[in-house]
Amino acid sequence: MKIKLIDSVVRSFKVAKIFRENTDKINAIDFAPNGEHLISCSEDDQIVIYDCEKGTQSRTVNSKKYGVDLIHFTHANNTAIHSSTKVDDTIRYLSLHDNKYLRYFPGHTKKVISLCISPVEDTFLSGSLDKTLRLWDLRSPNCQGLMHLSGRPIAAYDPEGLIFAAGVNSESIKLYDLRSFDKGPFVTFKLNQEKECDWTGLKFSRDGKTILISTNGSVIRLVDAFHGTPLQTFTGYPNNKGIPIEASFSPDSQFIFSGSTDGRVHIWNADTGNKVSVLNGDHPGPVQCVQFNPKYMMLASACTNMAFWLPTSEEGL
């Protein structure tokens, strides 16, 4: 039985399960494409994997030596990539079932601030404060492509995995064709440069029509993916700590979810720009990560705690 996401259903979300596995803030989360598992990483150097069907924590893996950030499931079962917070700025490919590294991807000389995996194949993109964007293949430790940019780059693949977007210097979005990225971007959208904050994340909507820009301030932007036209600006949530708060789409691209430093989850209608709801969970600290499950009607949000949310209204049935 599929529930349709409408305003009343979104407002009915309540915390169904809270996990207190971490001793420091959770800095990244990622759902497996089939929606069955969620992976998280924290500043306490722990990687925690959750079972979304059972609503349980299934295992914990430590990354004490290198630290862990920007974690993503890869397409193979039980594997993930992540950036490092200690030693160096190498990206690491981890086998989760035996906690062994399968491969290292060295190259970046400063902190990696963006990491995304292709939705269709075993390639991934990384952006760093060294002002480069690198394209990688999981099967090779050598960088497959290198783009030198004029400022801090963040990246995202489109849902088809054919193009990628690079957000540069919090003021422009460049679109590249993956088959000919070495020719440079095929289009560049110039936006007004952020005065108060930096862009910290890009995401395409599932329908590929819009791009969501997250920041380390209290503003989220939505732009047209074909023309770069600004569509919406979402505000009215606090971020007084300058943290990179994640904004996410619902799978139907209709709603935008964001964390905040007030420990709540803020939700807007993507078409109208109107605030739909503010959800109160069991978050004593800033909520940095919020994502909607790609297959199940569930939402995850994280501060130091991890919260799983479920709708309590049947109206959308």
From Swiss-Prot:
Gene Ontology CC, one term: Set1C/COMPASS complex
Record keyword Nucleus present: yes
Residues that span the membrane, as ranges: none
SMART domains: WD40 (SM00320)
Subcellular location: Nucleus
One BP annotation, GO: chromatin remodeling
GO MF term (any one): chromatin binding
Predominant localisation class: nucleus
Disulfide bonds: none
Protein keywords: Nucleus, Repeat, Transcription, Transcription regulation, Transcription termination, WD repeat
Function: Component of the SET1 complex that specifically di- and trimethylates 'Lys-4' of histone H3. Together with su(sable), part of a transcription termination checkpoint that promotes transcription termination of aberrant RNAs and their subsequent degradation by the nuclear exosome.
Subunit structure: Component of the SET1 complex, composed at least of the catalytic subunit Set1, wds/WDR5, Wdr82, Rbbp5, ash2, Cfp1/CXXC1, hcf and Dpy-30L1. Interacts with male-specific lethal (MSL) histone acetyltransferase complex at least composed of mof, msl-1, msl-2 and msl-3. Interacts with su(sable).
PANTHER family membership: WD REPEAT-CONTAINING PROTEIN 82, WD40 REPEAT PROTEIN SWD2
Record family assignment: Belongs to the WD repeat SWD2 family.
Name this protein carries in UniProt: WD repeat-containing protein 82
Species name: Drosophila melanogaster (Fruit fly)
